[in-house]
Amino acid sequence: LAFFDESKNLKDRQINNIPIFGSFSRLIKLKQQFPDLEVWLAMPSIQTEKRRAIITKLEKIKVAVRTVPSFHELITDKKTMSDIQNLSLDDLLPRTRVERDVVDDSNDKNFLISGAGGSIGSEIVRQLLDSNPCSIILFDISEFNLFRVERECQAIISSKSLSTKIVPILGDIKDSKNLNFLFQQHKVDYVYHAAAYKHVPLVEDTNNIIKACENNVLGTLNLAKVSMENDVESFVMISTDKAVRPTNVMGASKRMAEILIQSLNTHASKTNFSMVRFGNVLNSSGSVIPLFIDQIAKGGPVTLTHKEVTRYFMTIPEASNLVLQASQMADGGEVFILDMGEQVKIYDLARKLIHLSG
Protein backbone atom coordinates (compact mmCIF):
# COMPACT_ATOMS: atom_id res chain seq x y z
CA LEU A 1 0.00 0.00 0.00
CA ALA A 2 1.31 3.47 -0.88
CA PHE A 3 0.06 7.02 -1.37
CA PHE A 4 0.75 9.13 -4.45
CA ASP A 5 0.59 12.90 -4.38
CA GLU A 6 2.32 15.47 -6.58
CA SER A 7 2.49 18.06 -3.80
CA LYS A 8 6.12 18.90 -3.06
CA ASN A 9 5.23 19.45 0.60
CA LEU A 10 4.37 15.76 0.95
CA LYS A 11 7.41 14.38 -0.82
CA ASP A 12 9.17 11.55 1.06
CA ARG A 13 6.71 11.80 3.96
CA GLN A 14 4.60 9.06 5.53
CA ILE A 15 1.06 8.65 6.84
CA ASN A 16 0.76 5.93 9.50
CA ASN A 17 4.07 4.50 8.26
CA ILE A 18 2.75 4.33 4.68
CA PRO A 19 5.07 6.10 2.20
CA ILE A 20 3.95 8.98 -0.01
CA PHE A 21 5.36 8.89 -3.54
CA GLY A 22 5.26 11.86 -5.87
CA SER A 23 7.00 10.49 -8.92
CA PHE A 24 5.03 8.71 -11.63
CA SER A 25 8.10 6.61 -12.38
CA ARG A 26 7.71 5.02 -8.93
CA LEU A 27 4.22 3.94 -9.90
CA ILE A 28 5.57 2.32 -13.06
CA LYS A 29 8.09 0.36 -10.98
CA LEU A 30 5.34 -0.74 -8.59
CA LYS A 31 3.30 -1.98 -11.54
CA GLN A 32 6.28 -4.05 -12.69
CA GLN A 33 6.68 -5.42 -9.18
CA PHE A 34 2.96 -6.03 -8.60
CA PRO A 35 1.19 -6.90 -11.91
CA ASP A 36 -2.26 -6.83 -10.26
CA LEU A 37 -1.76 -3.30 -8.95
CA GLU A 38 -4.89 -1.17 -8.47
CA VAL A 39 -4.97 2.62 -8.26
CA TRP A 40 -7.68 4.32 -6.24
CA LEU A 41 -8.42 7.93 -7.16
CA ALA A 42 -9.28 9.97 -4.07
CA MET A 43 -9.84 13.26 -5.89
CA PRO A 44 -13.62 13.64 -6.40
CA SER A 45 -13.50 17.44 -6.74
CA ILE A 46 -10.51 17.71 -9.08
CA GLN A 47 -10.98 19.61 -12.35
CA THR A 48 -12.11 17.43 -15.26
CA GLU A 49 -9.08 18.23 -17.43
CA LYS A 50 -6.59 17.32 -14.71
CA ARG A 51 -8.48 14.16 -13.81
CA ARG A 52 -8.52 13.09 -17.45
CA ALA A 53 -4.77 13.74 -17.76
CA ILE A 54 -4.09 11.51 -14.76
CA ILE A 55 -6.33 8.75 -16.13
CA THR A 56 -4.55 8.93 -19.49
CA LYS A 57 -1.21 8.39 -17.74
CA LEU A 58 -2.62 5.44 -15.78
CA GLU A 59 -4.10 3.95 -18.93
CA LYS A 60 -0.64 3.77 -20.51
CA ILE A 61 0.70 1.53 -17.75
CA LYS A 62 -2.45 -0.64 -17.78
CA VAL A 63 -3.46 -0.53 -14.14
CA ALA A 64 -6.97 -1.05 -12.84
CA VAL A 65 -8.40 2.29 -11.73
CA ARG A 66 -11.13 2.78 -9.12
CA THR A 67 -12.57 5.84 -7.38
CA VAL A 68 -13.36 6.40 -3.72
CA PRO A 69 -16.38 8.36 -2.42
CA SER A 70 -16.08 12.07 -1.77
CA PHE A 71 -15.69 13.42 1.76
CA HIS A 72 -19.20 14.90 1.53
CA GLU A 73 -20.68 11.51 0.63
CA LEU A 74 -18.91 9.94 3.59
CA ILE A 75 -19.94 12.46 6.25
CA THR A 76 -23.56 12.47 5.03
CA ASP A 77 -23.64 8.64 5.13
CA LYS A 78 -24.56 8.44 1.45
CA LYS A 79 -21.60 6.10 0.96
CA THR A 80 -18.97 4.31 3.01
CA MET A 81 -15.30 3.63 2.32
CA SER A 82 -16.30 0.18 1.10
CA ASP A 83 -18.12 1.81 -1.84
CA ILE A 84 -15.13 1.71 -4.16
CA GLN A 85 -16.36 2.16 -7.72
CA ASN A 86 -15.11 1.78 -11.25
CA LEU A 87 -14.42 4.95 -13.20
CA SER A 88 -17.34 7.09 -14.28
CA LEU A 89 -18.26 6.76 -17.94
CA ASP A 90 -17.68 10.52 -18.18
CA ASP A 91 -13.98 9.68 -17.91
CA LEU A 92 -14.15 7.78 -21.20
CA LEU A 93 -15.24 10.79 -23.25
CA PRO A 94 -12.55 13.09 -24.70
CA ARG A 95 -14.54 16.18 -23.72
CA THR A 96 -16.08 17.85 -20.68
CA ARG A 97 -19.57 16.73 -19.78
CA VAL A 98 -22.27 19.13 -21.00
CA GLU A 99 -24.65 20.18 -18.26
CA ARG A 100 -26.98 23.15 -18.11
CA ASP A 101 -29.35 24.27 -15.40
CA VAL A 102 -33.02 23.67 -16.04
CA VAL A 103 -35.37 26.36 -14.75
CA ASP A 104 -37.31 25.03 -11.78
CA ASP A 105 -40.98 25.78 -12.44
CA SER A 106 -42.43 22.32 -11.98
CA ASN A 107 -43.57 22.29 -8.36
CA ASP A 108 -47.24 22.31 -9.31
CA LYS A 109 -46.90 20.24 -12.51
CA ASN A 110 -47.73 16.62 -13.30
CA PHE A 111 -45.34 14.66 -15.51
CA LEU A 112 -45.73 11.44 -17.46
CA ILE A 113 -42.66 9.57 -18.68
CA SER A 114 -43.25 6.71 -21.11
CA GLY A 115 -40.57 4.05 -20.90
CA ALA A 116 -39.85 5.32 -17.38
CA GLY A 117 -38.05 2.14 -16.40
CA GLY A 118 -35.46 2.36 -19.17
CA SER A 119 -32.00 3.88 -18.92
CA ILE A 120 -33.06 7.28 -20.32
CA GLY A 121 -36.54 7.36 -18.83
CA SER A 122 -35.31 6.57 -15.33
CA GLU A 123 -32.63 9.29 -15.48
CA ILE A 124 -35.24 11.83 -16.61
CA VAL A 125 -37.24 10.85 -13.54
CA ARG A 126 -34.22 11.30 -11.26
CA GLN A 127 -33.53 14.77 -12.63
CA LEU A 128 -37.20 15.73 -12.36
CA LEU A 129 -37.22 14.77 -8.70
CA ASP A 130 -34.67 17.53 -8.06
CA SER A 131 -37.53 19.97 -8.77
CA ASN A 132 -39.96 18.23 -6.39
CA PRO A 133 -42.89 18.28 -8.88
CA CYS A 134 -46.47 17.58 -7.88
CA SER A 135 -46.51 14.08 -9.40
CA ILE A 136 -44.60 11.82 -11.76
CA ILE A 137 -46.42 9.06 -13.63
CA LEU A 138 -44.06 6.20 -14.40
CA PHE A 139 -45.48 4.55 -17.52
CA ASP A 140 -43.85 1.34 -18.74
CA ILE A 141 -44.78 -1.95 -20.35
CA SER A 142 -42.12 -3.85 -18.36
CA GLU A 143 -43.24 -4.91 -14.90
CA PHE A 144 -39.70 -5.41 -13.60
CA ASN A 145 -38.39 -2.08 -14.92
CA LEU A 146 -41.41 -0.28 -13.46
CA PHE A 147 -40.95 -1.93 -10.07
CA ARG A 148 -37.26 -1.05 -10.01
CA VAL A 149 -37.65 2.65 -10.92
CA GLU A 150 -40.63 3.11 -8.58
CA ARG A 151 -38.65 1.67 -5.69
CA GLU A 152 -35.70 3.95 -6.47
CA CYS A 153 -37.99 7.00 -6.64
CA GLN A 154 -39.50 6.24 -3.25
CA ALA A 155 -36.01 5.94 -1.76
CA ILE A 156 -35.01 9.34 -3.20
CA ILE A 157 -38.22 10.96 -1.97
CA SER A 158 -37.68 9.55 1.50
CA SER A 159 -34.02 10.59 1.72
CA LYS A 160 -34.71 14.15 0.48
CA SER A 161 -38.09 14.61 2.22
CA LEU A 162 -39.84 15.42 -1.06
CA SER A 163 -43.59 15.71 -1.55
CA THR A 164 -43.74 14.34 -5.11
CA LYS A 165 -46.38 11.68 -5.70
CA ILE A 166 -45.12 8.69 -7.69
CA VAL A 167 -47.71 6.83 -9.78
CA PRO A 168 -46.43 3.57 -11.35
CA ILE A 169 -48.58 2.49 -14.31
CA LEU A 170 -48.21 -0.67 -16.37
CA GLY A 171 -49.43 0.08 -19.86
CA ASP A 172 -49.00 0.19 -23.62
CA ILE A 173 -48.66 3.47 -25.53
CA LYS A 174 -50.92 2.02 -28.24
CA ASP A 175 -53.85 1.69 -25.80
CA SER A 176 -55.81 4.92 -26.36
CA LYS A 177 -58.59 4.11 -23.92
CA ASN A 178 -56.23 3.49 -21.02
CA LEU A 179 -54.15 6.56 -21.86
CA ASN A 180 -57.16 8.87 -22.02
CA PHE A 181 -58.38 7.65 -18.65
CA LEU A 182 -54.90 8.12 -17.20
CA PHE A 183 -54.47 11.66 -18.57
CA GLN A 184 -57.89 12.77 -17.35
CA GLN A 185 -57.42 11.23 -13.92
CA HIS A 186 -53.99 12.74 -13.28
CA LYS A 187 -54.21 16.02 -15.24
CA VAL A 188 -50.92 15.48 -17.06
CA ASP A 189 -49.02 18.69 -17.92
CA TYR A 190 -45.80 17.36 -19.47
CA VAL A 191 -45.05 14.19 -21.44
CA TYR A 192 -41.54 12.85 -22.03
CA HIS A 193 -41.82 10.02 -24.54
CA ALA A 194 -38.89 7.64 -24.05
CA ALA A 195 -40.63 4.35 -24.84
CA ALA A 196 -39.30 2.76 -28.03
CA TYR A 197 -37.85 -0.33 -29.63
CA LYS A 198 -34.30 0.83 -30.35
CA HIS A 199 -31.99 -2.18 -30.63
CA VAL A 200 -30.97 -1.91 -34.28
CA PRO A 201 -30.13 -5.58 -35.08
CA LEU A 202 -33.22 -6.88 -33.27
CA VAL A 203 -35.56 -4.39 -34.92
CA GLU A 204 -33.96 -5.14 -38.31
CA ASP A 205 -34.97 -8.80 -38.04
CA THR A 206 -37.86 -9.52 -40.42
CA ASN A 207 -39.76 -11.14 -37.54
CA ASN A 208 -39.77 -7.86 -35.61
CA ILE A 209 -40.15 -5.10 -38.21
CA ILE A 210 -43.94 -4.83 -37.98
CA LYS A 211 -43.99 -4.71 -34.17
CA ALA A 212 -41.18 -2.16 -34.15
CA CYS A 213 -43.07 0.14 -36.50
CA GLU A 214 -46.32 -0.34 -34.59
CA ASN A 215 -44.62 0.74 -31.39
CA ASN A 216 -42.24 3.44 -32.65
CA VAL A 217 -44.58 5.03 -35.20
CA LEU A 218 -48.21 4.23 -34.33
CA GLY A 219 -47.57 4.14 -30.59
CA THR A 220 -45.90 7.56 -30.71
CA LEU A 221 -48.73 9.00 -32.80
CA ASN A 222 -51.29 7.59 -30.40
CA LEU A 223 -49.59 9.03 -27.31
CA ALA A 224 -49.18 12.39 -29.04
CA LYS A 225 -52.85 12.55 -30.04
CA VAL A 226 -54.00 11.70 -26.52
CA SER A 227 -51.67 14.41 -25.19
CA MET A 228 -53.14 16.95 -27.62
CA GLU A 229 -56.73 15.96 -26.81
CA ASN A 230 -56.05 16.43 -23.10
CA ASP A 231 -54.34 19.84 -23.49
CA VAL A 232 -50.91 18.72 -22.32
CA GLU A 233 -48.56 21.73 -22.20
CA SER A 234 -45.47 20.05 -23.64
CA PHE A 235 -44.73 16.78 -25.43
CA VAL A 236 -41.08 15.87 -26.01
CA MET A 237 -40.29 12.84 -28.14
CA ILE A 238 -36.92 11.15 -27.80
CA SER A 239 -35.53 10.37 -31.24
CA THR A 240 -32.14 9.38 -32.62
CA ASP A 241 -29.45 10.64 -34.96
CA LYS A 242 -30.16 7.46 -36.94
CA ALA A 243 -33.33 9.22 -38.16
CA VAL A 244 -31.12 11.39 -40.40
CA ARG A 245 -31.08 9.72 -43.83
CA PRO A 246 -32.00 6.43 -42.15
CA THR A 247 -30.27 3.26 -43.27
CA ASN A 248 -32.08 0.86 -40.93
CA VAL A 249 -35.60 0.11 -39.74
CA MET A 250 -35.12 1.67 -36.32
CA GLY A 251 -33.92 4.96 -37.80
CA ALA A 252 -36.67 4.97 -40.42
CA SER A 253 -39.37 4.33 -37.82
CA LYS A 254 -38.08 7.23 -35.73
CA ARG A 255 -37.98 9.55 -38.73
CA MET A 256 -41.59 8.66 -39.55
CA ALA A 257 -42.53 9.42 -35.95
CA GLU A 258 -40.75 12.79 -36.14
CA ILE A 259 -42.70 13.76 -39.27
CA LEU A 260 -45.99 12.82 -37.62
CA ILE A 261 -45.17 14.81 -34.48
CA GLN A 262 -44.24 17.87 -36.53
CA SER A 263 -47.50 17.59 -38.48
CA LEU A 264 -49.49 17.58 -35.24
CA ASN A 265 -47.77 20.77 -34.14
CA THR A 266 -49.37 22.66 -37.04
CA HIS A 267 -52.86 21.97 -35.73
CA ALA A 268 -54.62 24.37 -33.38
CA SER A 269 -53.55 22.89 -30.07
CA LYS A 270 -52.40 23.92 -26.63
CA THR A 271 -49.70 21.24 -26.78
CA ASN A 272 -46.16 22.23 -27.71
CA PHE A 273 -44.48 19.36 -29.58
CA SER A 274 -40.71 18.97 -29.90
CA MET A 275 -38.13 16.26 -30.48
CA VAL A 276 -34.66 15.49 -29.17
CA ARG A 277 -32.19 13.49 -31.23
CA PHE A 278 -29.63 11.46 -29.32
CA GLY A 279 -26.31 10.15 -30.49
CA ASN A 280 -24.98 6.95 -28.99
CA VAL A 281 -25.69 7.08 -25.27
CA LEU A 282 -22.94 5.63 -23.10
CA ASN A 283 -24.10 2.70 -20.94
CA SER A 284 -27.72 2.81 -22.09
CA SER A 285 -29.38 -0.57 -22.56
CA GLY A 286 -28.15 -2.19 -25.74
CA SER A 287 -25.15 0.13 -26.14
CA VAL A 288 -21.60 -1.12 -26.65
CA ILE A 289 -20.29 -0.22 -23.18
CA PRO A 290 -22.25 -2.84 -21.17
CA LEU A 291 -21.27 -5.39 -23.82
CA PHE A 292 -17.58 -4.47 -23.55
CA ILE A 293 -17.67 -4.54 -19.74
CA ASP A 294 -19.28 -7.98 -19.79
CA GLN A 295 -16.72 -9.29 -22.27
CA ILE A 296 -13.82 -7.88 -20.22
CA ALA A 297 -15.22 -9.41 -17.00
CA LYS A 298 -15.32 -12.81 -18.73
CA GLY A 299 -11.73 -12.48 -19.87
CA GLY A 300 -12.46 -11.47 -23.44
CA PRO A 301 -12.30 -11.32 -26.32
CA VAL A 302 -13.72 -7.83 -26.83
CA THR A 303 -15.39 -7.79 -30.24
CA LEU A 304 -15.63 -4.89 -32.71
CA THR A 305 -17.31 -4.63 -36.10
CA HIS A 306 -14.35 -2.66 -37.50
CA LYS A 307 -11.26 -0.99 -36.05
CA GLU A 308 -11.94 2.35 -37.76
CA VAL A 309 -15.62 2.74 -36.80
CA THR A 310 -16.33 6.09 -35.09
CA ARG A 311 -19.40 7.38 -33.28
CA TYR A 312 -20.63 10.46 -31.42
CA PHE A 313 -21.27 9.73 -27.76
CA MET A 314 -23.18 11.35 -24.93
CA THR A 315 -23.82 10.26 -21.35
CA ILE A 316 -27.21 9.31 -19.92
CA PRO A 317 -27.35 12.43 -17.67
CA GLU A 318 -26.47 14.64 -20.67
CA ALA A 319 -29.21 13.06 -22.76
CA SER A 320 -31.82 13.41 -20.03
CA ASN A 321 -30.85 17.00 -19.27
CA LEU A 322 -31.31 17.84 -22.95
CA VAL A 323 -34.85 16.44 -22.85
CA LEU A 324 -35.78 18.67 -19.91
CA GLN A 325 -34.26 21.70 -21.62
CA ALA A 326 -36.21 20.99 -24.81
CA SER A 327 -39.54 21.23 -23.01
CA GLN A 328 -38.63 24.74 -21.82
CA MET A 329 -36.97 26.04 -24.98
CA ALA A 330 -39.32 24.71 -27.67
CA ASP A 331 -41.64 27.00 -29.60
CA GLY A 332 -43.12 24.03 -31.45
CA GLY A 333 -41.90 21.48 -33.97
CA GLU A 334 -38.16 21.84 -33.29
CA VAL A 335 -35.62 19.06 -33.29
CA PHE A 336 -32.94 19.54 -30.59
CA ILE A 337 -29.49 17.96 -30.69
CA LEU A 338 -26.47 18.08 -28.38
CA ASP A 339 -23.06 19.24 -29.56
CA MET A 340 -21.11 16.08 -28.78
CA GLY A 341 -17.72 17.32 -29.92
CA GLU A 342 -15.55 15.04 -32.03
CA GLN A 343 -16.41 11.48 -32.99
CA VAL A 344 -14.82 8.75 -30.86
CA LYS A 345 -13.25 5.58 -32.22
CA ILE A 346 -15.01 2.52 -30.81
CA TYR A 347 -11.62 0.80 -30.85
CA ASP A 348 -10.10 3.52 -28.62
CA LEU A 349 -13.06 3.29 -26.26
CA ALA A 350 -12.70 -0.48 -25.94
CA ARG A 351 -8.93 -0.25 -25.46
CA LYS A 352 -9.31 2.35 -22.72
CA LEU A 353 -11.85 0.17 -20.90
CA ILE A 354 -9.52 -2.83 -21.12
CA HIS A 355 -6.48 -0.92 -19.85
CA LEU A 356 -8.33 0.75 -16.98
CA SER A 357 -9.77 -2.61 -15.95
CA GLY A 358 -6.22 -3.84 -15.36
Q: Where do the PLM segments sit?
A:
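NAD(P)-cofactor binding segment of oxidoreductase domains
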Residues: 52-66, 135-142, 184-185, 190, ...
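Flexible, Lys/Arg-rich cytosolic regulatory linkers and terminal tails that connect or flank
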Residues: 24, 51-110, 228
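Conserved Rossmann-fold cofactor-binding substructure of NAD(P)-dependent oxidoreductases
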Residues: 167-190
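Mid/C-terminal beta-alpha module of Rossmann-like enzyme folds, strongest
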Residues: 329-358
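Conserved beta-loop-beta element that borders a ligand/cofactor-binding pocket
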Residues: 231-234, 260-310, 334-337
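A solvent-exposed beta-alpha-beta segment
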Residues: 1-64, 141-148, 167, 171
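Conserved Rossmann-fold NAD(P)-dependent oxidoreductase catalytic core, especially the SDR/UDP-sugar
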Residues: 76, 193, 197-258, 263-264
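N-terminal Rossmann NAD(P)H-binding glycine-rich loop of SDR-like oxidoreductase domains
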Residues: 111-131
